[in-house]
Each structure stands twice: as C-alpha cells, then as structure tokens.
Design a protein with these regions (language model features):
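N-terminal secretory/membrane-targeting segments
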Residues: 1-58, 512, 516
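Anion-binding catalytic surfaces of enzymes that hydrolyze or transfer phosphate/sulfate esters
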Residues: 9-11, 21-23, 152, 159-213, ...
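Active-site-proximal alpha/beta segments of enzymes that process anionic O-linked groups
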Residues: 32-43, 52-183, 192, 277-287, ...
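A long, amphipathic alpha-helix that forms part
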Residues: 42-55, 170-179, 192-232, 236-244, ...
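Catalytic metal-binding/acid-base residues of hydrolase active sites
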Residues: 68-69, 189-191, 236-238, 262
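Substrate-binding rim/cap in mid-to-C-terminal beta-strand-loop elements of soluble/periplasmic
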Residues: 100-110, 246-289
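Phosphate/adenylate-binding glycine loop and adjacent helical scaffold
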Residues: 304-368, 392, 396-399, 465
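Alpha-helical transmembrane segments of integral membrane proteins
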Residues: 354-516
Length: 516
C-alpha cells in the first residue's frame, strides 16, 4: 500500500517537474512562435496603371510617429495645419497593435493575420509586397529615416537609402540625413518610448509629443503643399499607464492626416481602415497597388474620398477604380476555390478557419476532462469530493482573474508593456493566486494530502492548456490569429505553470515528510 502511494507521489512529483520545464520552454519560445513572414493565404493580383496620373507629387513625406495616441496627435500644431490643408481621419489599426506588425499593415495594406508579421523580433523580410517596393519598381527613389531598422528589414528592396539613427535624441527629420527623394519615410521612436516608460497620460509623454511636433514642423518648412504630399500617422497609441498590443480604442484608433497635392479637403474626422494606407499612397502617387493588399470586405472605397477629383485626373481615377474591382474579383474567385462554394468572402474564410480552431479546442477540452476523471479514479476520490475539487479549481481561476485584473489589467498583450516590469508583476500575480487557492483549500477541505493531489491536478490542467494552445493554434501561430485572451495566454500561462508547478512540488515534498 505504502509502496503504491510512494509510486504515485513520485509520478506526481515528476509531472510537476516536467510542467516547470515545459513552462520555461513554452514561455521563452512564444515570441519566436508568433511570426511567419512567408504569410498566410496571400492573394497576388497583378496591377498596371493604364492611365498615368496627370501630375505626381514632387516629394512625398510619409511620417509614422511610433506610439502616438489620437488625443495627443490632435493637439499637435502640424496635425492641425495638415487638417486645414487636407483631411484627417480616425484610423483603425486592427487588433494586433504591435509595432513591426503595424509597419507591415501600413506598408502592404494587409492585416497581421495574413502578413505573418506578429512580433518585433523577427528581422526576416516579409513576403507580402509593400508600397515602397512598388514605388522603386516604378522608377521612384525611396528614402527612410528612423531610430530603428525595422522598415528596412521588413522591406529591404523598398529603399534606395535608409538612415538609421541609433541615438534617439537625434532628429530623424533633419536635413543632414540627405536631400528629399521622391518618397521619404520618417519614423521617430521617442514618443513610444515615453509611453512605455511613463504612460500615455504622463507629462513625459506630452513632452515627447511636443518635441515631435516641433521636428515635423521643421520638415514641413522644407516642403510646399501645392507640390508635395504629406501623410502623418501612427502605428498605435498607448494606454494611460503605458502599453499597447490590444484593441482598446485609445490604442488601435490613431489619427491619420493627408495633405498636399492631389488630396481632397474635408474637415470632419471620418473613419479610415489602416489597411487602406498603402493603397491611398498608391492612388496619390500614381502607382500600381501592392499585389497582396486586402481586397473584398475592405475599406478601399475611402480612396475616392481622399483623392481630389478634377477633369484632368478623371480618367486616371476611373482606371484606379477599375483596378480595385479587379482586385476584389480575383480575391473573390480565389476564396471560392479555397471555400469550395460561393460566396467567396474573407469573413466566411476567417469563420471557417476559426471554426477548425474551435473544434480543436473542443477535442482538447474533452481530452482534459477524461484525464481529470481518470485522475479522480486513480486517487479514489468520491464523487462529492470530486465536485468540491472542481468548484475549487473554478474558484482558483476566478482568483487568478481578479488578481491579474487588479495588478496588471486586461488579459491581453497590452499589460506586458516592458518585460522587466511584466515578469516580476506577473510572477507575483501567479504566486498570490496560488497561495490564496491553497489557503482556500485548507479552509474548505482541510486535508493536506488531498491538497497536494488537487494541486497536482491544477498543474496538469495548466500543462494541458499550454500544450493544447500549440495543438489548437499551431507552431508557428497559424491563421487566423487567436482572440485577445488566447493570444496573450502563453505569456502568463507559462509563468503560472512554473509557479503552480513549484508550489505543487513543495506540497508533495511536505506531504512525504509528514507521511508515516
């Protein structure tokens, strides 16, 4: 009898040790698991500008202020100047508000689900075509100036010249970075850094916004809006406490302004899909569309509200409208092949692929349920006691949610903000929740031996959830992207698995010392 009990205790201890190791491996590996720069379900459509644009802008300045909230952008003098000269809109940057994926979205016209750009770490070029590559292929010269190399890394064939300023005190808009070329991409980083370090509602953030306002004003002084084109936007905003990555309004909704040659003037703040940024540049510059841009269930009709229509460019705009319809038709035909029936729409395709993920979730849940039942039978836990344990596990999940919400916030990428802050706070959340759960068990059940067994059950459930995430969503993370909580879970889940695994190991060792 004792020998069998010792064997079960040793097996439980082994499971907990394995869980701790798996937690470390999956947690550290999740960042690398996110991206796949070959992309997913790319539809390539060949385009040709059959009617040339009558007059192309002399210089184009495309400005991405990293981490600029919409409310802060509205206070900038340069944004107000661009609004008077053209139009500003509220741009929806999607639900994956991480910087490198947003650079991909702005440049290609495609969402992160399909570009495959899902983290800031992977430096490999993106398969989806960018507007910068289109511009160079059309004979234009493209320059970049940034505190990061990420635009150039994503699209190495998209730039003739790229100035990388490692010193973030440097002005990326300054003339010493070279004369203005046909197309110029400017990307300052310090507003985002202020948001991470101090929060989007802090005086330091406001000071960074004031700095970029002044530096952009210096750039505008070198331009002539009767001849040149300026686009001002951001990749994402910041929450008040700092952080981005989720789909909160203050994070995903940013200001985008178009002003200069070829831009229609309007004073309202109409809606805009961030995926339409690259297509809008294509229309205003007289370029073909990026071949992989989103078409079908899109926001491309806004292009005809941004471009100023005149008798001189009527034929050109008609040609571009026809091109958009060709893109939509080709996407529809391709989707009908993939779906096997009509109508071929992106929402239907997303729904089908998400449905496959849901079925895998169901299979995982069934497997976990069977394992839990077998665990109860192996431990000879009566039905009533099993129900109490089930309620206790549910209570433990509720405790985790409450403590996480109180300390970190929403269950999404936004709470990560800075790694050096997130890791100790998330570890504290997991430890507090684990201790509270243990104390609740001691108070309700009052059986230390059963506590150790039930804690091992929790560790097994967490382990199954972490491995199940890989089974459900793939390695690398597949298509479509998981919902926000499931997208974030491997970060916190790994920390919880390690924490609960160590607590369970401690309980098992204590129980062994107490056993006769």
């Amino acid at each position: 009898m004792r020998q069998a009990r010792d064997w079960r205790r040793l097996a439980a201890l082994g499971l907990c040790v394995v869980a701790v190791v798996v937690g470390f491996v999956l947690g550290e590996g999740y960042i690398d698991r996110l991206p796949q720069h070959a992309g997913y379900f790319l539809v390539a459509v060949d385009d040709e500008v059959r009617v040339p644009i009558p007059t192309r802008p002399r210089h184009t300045a495309f400005i991405v202020v990293d981490g600029l909230r919409r409310d802060s952008a509205e206070t900038m003098h340069v944004a107000q100047e661009l609004a008077r000269a053209g139009q500003c809109r509220i741009s929806d940057q999607g639900s994956f508000t991480v910087s490198r994926p947003e650079y991909a979205l702005l440049s290609t016209g495609l969402e992160a689900d399909r570009t495959g750009s899902r983290n800031n770490d992977l430096t490999a070029p993106l398969a989806a075509e960018s507007i910068w590559q289109v511009a160079r292929a059309s004979g234009l010269h493209v320059a970049g100036s940034s505190h990061l190399r990420w635009f150039e890394q994503l699209f190495p064939a998209g730039f003739d010249r790229f100035a990388h300023e490692k010193d973030h005190r440097a002005n990326v808009f300054a003339p010493e970075h070279g004369e203005l070329l046909d197309v110029n991409v400017f990307h300052p980083l310090y507003v985002d850094e202020a948001g991470h370090q101090h929060g989007g509602a802090s005086p330091a953030y406001a000071a960074a916004v004031a700095r970029v306002d002044g530096e952009i004003a210096g750039l505008l002084a070198r331009l002539d809006l009767s001849q040149d084109l300026v686009v001002l936007t951001a990749d994402h905003g910041h929450r008040d406490a700092g952080g981005h990555g989720g789909a909160q309004p203050e994070i995903k909704n940013v200001l985008v302004c178009f002003a200069g040659r070829g831009v229609e003037r309007r004073s309202d703040r109409a809606a805009f899909d961030g995926r339409s940024t690259a297509p809008a540049l294509a229309v205003l510059l007289g370029l073909r569309f990026p071949r992989n841009m989103r078409a079908g269930d899109d926001g491309l009709d806004v292009l005809w509200e941004i471009a100023h229509a005149t008798p001189e460019n009527a034929a050109y705009l008609a040609d571009r409208r026809a091109a958009v319809e060709r893109f939509r038709t080709q996407n529809r035909i391709t989707l009908e092949k993939w779906l096997g029936d009509q109508p071929g729409t992106w929402p239907r395709f997303y729904e089908r692929e998400a449905g496959a993920q849901t079925r895998r979730i169901g299979a995982t849940a069934l497997f976990v349920l069977v394992c839990a039942v077998l665990s109860f039978r192996l431990r000879k836990v009566p039905a009533r006691a099993a129900l109490v344990t089930t309620a206790w596990v549910a209570f433990g999940m509720f405790v985790v949610w409450c403590v996480h919400h109180a300390v970190l916030g929403d269950f999404d990428f936004t709470v990560i903000n800075l790694r050096e802050r997130f890791l100790p706070r998330a570890s504290a959340v997991a430890l507090v929740a684990a201790v509270a759960t243990v104390l609740a068990h001691l108070w309700i059940v009052g059986d230390r031996r059963r506590l150790a067994g039930d804690m091992v059950l929790v560790v097994g459930l967490l382990l199954a959830a972490m491995l199940g995430h890989v089974y459900v969503y793939g390695w690398p993370l597949g298509f479509p992207l998981p919902p926000q909580p499931a997208r974030y879970f491997p970060f916190f889940g790994a920390i919880a698995l390690v924490t609960y695994g160590l607590v369970a190991c401690g309980l098992l060792l204590l129980e062994r010392r107490r056993s006769p």
